[in-house]
Amino acid sequence: MVTRDRAENRDGPKMLKPLVEKRRRDRINRSLEELRLLLLERTRDQNLRNPKLEKAEILEFAVGYLRERSRVEPPGVPRSPVQDAEALASCYLSGFRECLLRLAAFAHDASPAARAQLFSALHGYLRPKPPRPKPVDPRPPAPRPSLDPAAPALGPALHQRPPVHQGHPSPRCAWSPSLCSPRAGDSGAPAPLTGLLPPPPPPHRQDGAPKAPLPPPPAFWRPWP
């Protein structure tokens, strides 16, 4: 009984070893593939475009790139904001590639039902979202002045004069029609109101002008010579 248990315990690690080895090789291959893509982005070397490049060659490219960067940028030198932004973008791209590689490995080993469910969820997440509607103000809008051209305008009406009634004559013209009506033969200008105006004052004598002689007094009849 004890011998059988020991035999089963010995066979357990032997059965798990191929699976662990396979996972370890998959991790190495994914890391090397990511390293190849990063080196291709940085160096633009056409040899790195080959997806079946030898692992040793990928490692040699990585060592040469790091050695060259250490010569250009010695350690301890502060980096500029542009370099920090490039480093952040590179980290983001590398993380995105790592996620894609893990997703591809999971989809390859998953069942068809799980793969279909995963792709459906990804498709719904990556689908463009419709724009959100703007919030509606519950308060009613304020009334605006009418812009209808047929509506009466208020501006010109303020400058119009009140109409003059022509039915009854004015009291001034009631007793003297000749003062209000123009004379015959005139050029259309109204006659001056001579009956209502006071007589013009005598002309003032200018200083220094000679005085006019006074007329002689009238003769009176006397009984004596």
Swiss-Prot record:
* Any one GO BP annotation for this protein: mesoderm development
Record's GO cellular component, any one?
A: nucleus
Present the record's domain note: Has a particular type of basic domain which includes a helix-interrupting proline. The C-terminal WRPW motif is a transcriptional repression motif which is necessary for interaction with Groucho/TLE family members, transcriptional corepressors recruited to specific target DNA by Hairy-related proteins.
- Gene3D superfamilies from the entry? Helix-loop-helix DNA-binding domain
Which stretches make up the bHLH domain?
12-69
The organism that produces this protein has a lineage beginning with:
Eukaryota, Metazoa, Chordata, Craniata, Vertebrata
Region Disordered: which residues?
125-225
Any idea what this protein is called?
A: Transcription factor HES-7
Q: Which domain of life is it from?
A: Eukaryota
Tell me which species this is from: Homo sapiens (Human)
Extract the InterPro entries matched here.
bHLH_dom, HES-7_bHLH-O, HES_HEY, HLH_DNA-bd_sf, Orange_dom
Q: Which Pfam family, giving just one, matches this sequence?
A: HLH
